[in-house]
């Protein structure tokens, strides 16, 4: 399975999503089977911890809805467990500089393009990848969304924008 959310974005299609900040697998399952293209799992402003996030991502399996998680900051420590759980996109808050934008990309990508460690234990099931090489390549399909929320980000916008098909600015 590729990333249907990414495919629709790349085609310029409108993608309908829904946000949840409640740590509920039942809610994640209901929402992901309600016709949405993506499920916004909010770990920054909600009560969702990594265990709940993993279970919520698992609850989206079997649907065409891509789980996309807003992490607390653009770091490997917050991003790696979310991706290892099977997230198909990551929303990074407070991207204010070229450095924070680069840190976000590095947290998603495997070496040599990034700094993400290899942990192919759960996510390949969500991505339906049985081959390790195929799963490694699937990191290129992860949608990276940078939130522009601060005046410093506006002032640095030309530096923040990295021309890469998996990046989006909001």
What are these regions (language model features)?
Residues 94, 144-158:
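Active-site glycine- and acidic-residue-rich loops that bind
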Residues 3, 45-59, 74-78, 96-111, ...:
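Active-site-adjacent beta->alpha loops and helix N-cap segments on the catalytic face
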Residues 76-88, 99-100, 154-159:
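Catalytic cores of alpha/beta
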């Amino acid at each position: 399975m590729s990333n249907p959310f990414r495919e629709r974005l790349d085609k310029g299609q409108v993608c309908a999503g829904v946000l949840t900040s409640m740590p509920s697998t039942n809610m994640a399952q209901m929402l992901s089977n309600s016709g949405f293209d993506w499920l916004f799992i909010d770990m920054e402003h909600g009560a969702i911890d990594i265990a709940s996030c993993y279970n919520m991502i698992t609850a989206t399996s079997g649907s065409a809805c891509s789980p996309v998680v807003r992490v607390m900051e653009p770091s490997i420590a917050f991003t790696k467990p979310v991706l290892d759980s099977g997230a198909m996109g990551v929303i990074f808050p407070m991207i204010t500089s070229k450095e924070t934008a680069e840190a976000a990309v590095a947290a998603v990508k495997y070496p040599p393009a990034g700094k993400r460690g290899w942990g192919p234990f759960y996510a390949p099931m969500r991505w339906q990848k049985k081959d390790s090489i195929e799963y490694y390549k699937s990191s290129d399909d992860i949608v990276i969304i940078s939130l522009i929320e601060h005046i410093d980000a506006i002032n640095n916008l030309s530096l923040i924008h990295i021309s890469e098909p998996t990046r989006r600015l909001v």
